Amino acid sequence: MPKVAYSDEDRERIRMQLVTVGLELMAKQGIQHTTVEQVYKKVGISRTFFYSFFATKEDLIVETLYLQQPKIIKYVQTLMADPALSWRDAVKQFLHACCYGEKNGIAVLTIEEQQLIFKRLSKESYQVFRQKQLRLFGEILENFGIRADTA
């Protein structure tokens, strides 16, 4: 089969599709039950082409988690802006969504999945992930009116 030359725009569009489809599948069926094969087949590319975007499944997982961060912040803001919810109820609803994310379209990592991912990420990817995670948690706390400690 002849190789297809993809423009930078095509590659970026395909990469975004992989991340979006990955997030949809992971939110619906869980991270452990989502396979790389499901993702690349749904996007309509080959396994080899998938790995030109992501070296490992864990790299894809991390990118899907980055993609959902703004969605999580928006969800917190929506809860806090709801006059029908007390602060306590907003926090309770948020925590429930985090624990049962698949029902709310949020991909949630178990402790075991986190540990497995951390082992397989490069040192640089791990550091970037932790920094982005800390920023996310700080922003969540601030949206709930809790001053995040920057230490």
Task: Describe these PLM feature segments.
Residues 1-29, 38:
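Basic, helix-initiating cap at the start of DNA-binding domains
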Residues 17, 54, 59-68, 75, ...:
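Alpha-helical DNA-contacting segments of helix-turn-helix folds
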Residues 25-59, 63:
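Helix-turn-helix
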Residues 32-33, 146-150:
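Short, charged helix-capping/linker segments at alpha-helix termini
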Residues 63, 74-104:
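Hydrophobic alpha-helical connector segments
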Residues 70-73, 119-146:
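Amphipathic alpha-helical packing segments from all-alpha helical-bundle domains
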Residues 77, 110-120:
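Short linear capping/connector segments at secondary-structure termini
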